[in-house]
């Protein structure tokens, strides 16, 4: 019941971290959309484990198989099914902790809710579930490029207490991908990498903030009042594993400003487009996109599973000391960048189809 998302462009993800595979079914994608399969694989490669010294060493190729919905590389308008097989899962790594509630992990709440859980690898609570989201998000990005020439870029803004000065309007994809932490500010990236490595050696972890910009978004996306654009973006992004906060535009910083400081003055224009002198609104006003860049940020907590000893309990409520084994990211942010892009793309693609259906010219 909680594994589907969207109204017109819908996705349903399936699979567990240590099961046979994970994947997604997309429904509502328009027909005759020409897809670049390499782009889907490239996005999955950016998400996959084992890609650098600061990510989990789990070695998965994450090669996507497209089972339905395409003729050649064109969409048929029918459900698109994609799957990635799990090849390097190690259930034995979890044999000693399968009845242990890891602090701040989903073990305890899944067990209390369902009375059963896939303890090996975290099951559906694992970040491996996001493979389906990233694959579907890649399709959504290609749809947005074709119909609106929209570009979506995300990057690591902060790790622990190291924050990079970045201008969202100037960031390029190549700048983001030039280092393993996916921060376009190289001097800050070097410090971030050192910090993640240091915490990893201690058996600890750290969190941070990912920032995202949407360039050339269509005007009019968002369905007030309950499906405002920022509301759906918040829901989508807060559904990602390890997320703890969301803000758009000036965010919480805007609460320190006066109205005269925060308001975005409209500029005269000969076109039918809206232009503002500033963008504290982050491209969204009244829950509807105004055509300016959409700028948002997502906070991720430190990885819950760490090698340091922690006090916890088992399923029977007995006090125990946990020292987790297995393979885990000391920081999820570098691999979460394509996840953020994917969820933003899925929301925008869904709202684009809804806008075209309700408010056609």
Swiss-Prot record:
CDD domains: Chorismate_synthase. Its EC number is 4.2.3.5. GO terms for cellular component: cytosol. Its cofactor is FMNH2. NADP(+) binds at residue 47. Keywords: Amino-acid biosynthesis, Aromatic amino acid biosynthesis, FAD, Flavoprotein, FMN, Lyase, NADP. PROSITE patterns: CHORISMATE_SYNTHASE_1, CHORISMATE_SYNTHASE_2, CHORISMATE_SYNTHASE_3. FMN binds at residues 124-126, 286, 301-305, 327. Reduced FMN (FMNH(2)). The keyword DNA-binding does not apply. GO terms for biological process: amino acid biosynthetic process; aromatic amino acid family biosynthetic process; chorismate biosynthetic process. It catalyses: 5-O-(1-carboxyvinyl)-3-phosphoshikimate = chorismate + phosphate. Pathway: Metabolic intermediate biosynthesis; chorismate biosynthesis; chorismate from D-erythrose 4-phosphate and phosphoenolpyruvate: step 7/7. GO terms for molecular function: chorismate synthase activity; FMN binding. Disulfide bonds: none annotated. InterPro entries: Chorismate_synth, Chorismate_synth_AroC_sf, Chorismate_synthase_CS. Coiled coil: none annotated. The keyword Lyase applies. SUPFAM superfamilies: Chorismate synthase, AroC. Homotetramer. This reaction introduces a second double bond into the aromatic ring system. Belongs to the chorismate synthase family. This is Chorismate synthase. It comes from Prochlorococcus marinus (strain NATL1A). The lineage of its organism: Bacteria, Bacillati, Cyanobacteriota, Cyanophyceae, Synechococcales.
